Structure formats: structure tokens, C-alpha cells
A protein has these predicted regions:
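Substrate-positioning beta->alpha
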Residues: 96, 147, 175, 192-212, ...
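Conserved Rossmann-fold NAD(P)-dependent oxidoreductase catalytic core, especially the SDR/UDP-sugar
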Residues: 89-140
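Conserved catalytic-site region of short-chain dehydrogenase/reductase
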Residues: 78, 115-124, 167-173
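N-terminal Rossmann NAD(P)H-binding glycine-rich loop of SDR-like oxidoreductase domains
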Residues: 4-24
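Short-chain dehydrogenase/reductase
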Residues: 87-91, 127-130, 134-149, 166, ...
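Conserved beta-loop-beta element that borders a ligand/cofactor-binding pocket
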Residues: 149-170
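Mid/C-terminal beta-alpha module of Rossmann-like enzyme folds, strongest
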Residues: 207-275, 291, 296, 304-325
């Protein structure tokens, strides 16, 4: 079995990647920046390694002897005040990691990008041949993910890129689980008018491992899931939890106006608002993703949303994240 290097291992997708890699018999060195991350990584069978994406020398030492890099770390902030930090992590960090991988003679670089690299500026169903417009986007998350992906595509290393859509599943503490907790507490002020493609975090991790095993170098894979409006999604959550929910969607213009109002307040408080103009724009977008290439070449599975949501809610209950029923 191989020795590999993983970033983002203490996060949502990264934790599942770590479990899949360890389960397949690989030795996983995982980037860690704190004692809490050390413990989380060790609990899943990984070897925590202290290094920083902003320090190429520390990365080169950490990568020595590794056959592959799985890069899943990212800054997903939707607040413009975090743009410089986000660019440093997503773009500069990826470039540093690529350079370190070349120096260490790593054989493959597997990069978790995002469907956001295509940007909300794209309309219709996205396929791997759809031109990416993240470089034109005013949303820094989209812009930074686009630039990071381009850096990977330009490297002489053998590479594979993955573009997951809305990731859901057990282990989610900070993504869609935040919305689910608002529904559970009946504090959701409104529902965005967009459409999402809900992807199973477990299947994303399995697809990445298969892509490496099958040496699908030079390929990009969209990893989507069942399409659903956010109204439909929230109503399914409400029904499963026995909670009332808003009946319809908040108009995009009203959501954006609310986000701008919160942004004005944030100038004085210095605290990141619950809704930002960037977040309002993305959740008002009608995202449609074609995963047929991944299904065909990686045996990727689009888990039905009701099943995926059921697993997510069961895990959240087991973690005490939902009110007792």
C-alpha cells in the first residue's frame, strides 16, 4: 500500500477521505495545525503532520516519500472581509502545495475544487465541457476556486480535479447542518429561491479514491446529486423533524437587500453576518449538474436525497445537534 498526504483531514470531506484511504490500507499523513486536529486525525487512523500551506519548506518536508497528494483543504467564507485570507489559502496555498509536491517527487495530485469554479454566472446544466467563468466572478470564493483549479491544470504533475456540488451527509457540522439546525429551532427567516444538487460526502470520497486507483490523470469530474429547490429541501427537513417551515421562497431581490442590510450592521460590529451578498447570490442560483462522466468512469453514486437526508439527520441526532423529540 502507498503513503499519501492529505489536507483538510479534520474537515467534513477531508475526514471521509481519510477514512476511505485508511480503510483501503494506505498510510495517510494529514496536515494539521492544532492539537484538536491532531486528535481528530489520529482517531480516524491518520498520522498528523504539522505544516502550513503558507510555508513551502514545511510542506516539502511533510511530503517526502509520499506517492500522492489529496488536497481537500479550502476556505469557504462568503464574506468579502475574508477575501485576502481566502485567496492566501485557496490560491497561494494550492500553488505552494503543488511546488512542494514537485520538489518531493510526488506521483499524483488529486484536487478537490468545486462546482463554484464554473460560477453562478453559468446557466443551464453544467458538464465538464462547460466553460468555467469563476475568473469573471465578483464572489471571491468562486474566483479563488477557479484560480486554484487552473494552477492544478497547469502543473506538470499527473493530476485529477473534482468539482463537487452541495455536499451533504454524516459528519457535517458547519455546512448544511447550520440550515438544518435553524429549521429544527424554527428560526429560519426565509428560504432562498435557488436550486441545488445535493451530493453524498461518502460517495465523493469513494470516487476520489477510485479515480486515483484507476489513474484517471488529466481528467475533471463533476460530482453532483439529486436536484432539488431549496424550498423542497427545507420542506423535507421540516417534515422529517416535525417542524413548521416557511411556505415559499424569499425573492432574490429581498434576500439580497437583507444581506446588504446585515453587511451595513457588520461594519460596526465586525462580526460576519449570517447572510452575505455573496451567499445570497449563490443560493438564488439554479444549479444543475451532470455527473454522468463520474457515474460512468468512477462508479459514482448519486444517493437519493431522502436517504441522504435521513442519514444526515440520524448522525446529527447521535451527536446531540438536534432537539430531543
Amino acid at each position: 500500500m502507498s503513503e499519501v498526504f492529505l489536507t483538510g483531514a479534520s474537515g467534513f470531506l477531508g475526514g471521509h477521505l481519510l477514512s476511505e484511504l485508511v480503510g483501503a490500507g494506505h498510510t495517510v499523513r494529514a496536515l494539521s495545525r492544532s492539537e484538536a486536529s491532531d486528535a481528530a486525525i489520529a482517531a480516524l487512523g491518520g498520522q498528523p503532520v504539522r505544516a502550513r500551506l503558507g510555508d513551502p519548506d514545511s510542506l516539502a518536508a511533510a511530503l517526502a516519500g509520499c506517492e500522492a497528494v489529496f488536497h481537500a483543504a479550502a476556505d469557504t467564507s462568503m464574506w468579502k472581509r475574508n477575501a485576502a485570507r481566502q485567496t492566501a489559502t485557496n490560491v497561494d496555498g494550492t500553488r505552494h502545495l503543488l511546488a512542494a509536491a514537485q520538489r518531493a517527487g510526488v506521483g499524483a495530485f488529486l484536487h478537490t475544487s468545486s462546482v463554484s469554479a464554473y460560477s453562478h454566472l453559468v446557466h443551464g446544466t453544467i458538464t465538464e465541457t462547460t466553460p468555467q467563468r469563476g475568473g469573471e466572478s465578483w464572489i471571491n470564493y468562486e474566483h479563488s476556486k477557479y484560480l486554484a483549479e487552473q494552477a492544478v491544470r497547469d502543473t506538470p504533475l499527473p493530476w485529477i480535479v473534482f468539482n463537487p456540488s452541495h455536499i451533504l451527509g454524516p459528519g457535517d457540522r458547519h455546512n448544511w447542518s447550520r440550515l438544518i439546525r435553524l429549521v429544527d429551532a424554527q428560526k429560519l427567516p426565509g428560504i432562498p429561491p435557488g436550486i441545488g444538487a445535493f451530493a453524498d460526502v461518502r460517495e465523493i470520497a469513494r470516487a476520489q479514491l477510485r479515480a486515483w486507483q484507476r489513474q484517471r490523470y488529466g481528467e475533471c469530474y463533476l460530482l453532483g446529486g439529486e436536484q432539488a429547490s431549496f424550498v423542497d429541501f427545507v420542506h423535507r427537513v421540516g417534515a422529517a423533524l416535525g417542524r413548521r417551515t416557511p411556505r415559499g421562497a424569499t425573492p432574490a431581490w429581498a434576500l439580497m437587500a437583507y444581506a446588504r442590510l446585515l453587511g451595513t450592521v457588520a461594519r460596526f460590529t465586525g462580526r460576519e453576518p449570517d447572510v452575505t451578498p455573496e451567499g445570497a447570490a449563490l443560493t438564488s442560483h439554479q444549479l444543475r449538474v451532470d455527473s454522468s462522466r463520474a457515474i460512468r468512469e468512477l462508479d459514482y453514486v448519486e444517493t437519493p436525497l431522502d436517504s441522504l437526508l435521513g442519514d444526515t439527520l440520524a448522525w446529527m441526532r447521535s451527536e446531540g445537534m438536534l432537539a430531543a423529540r
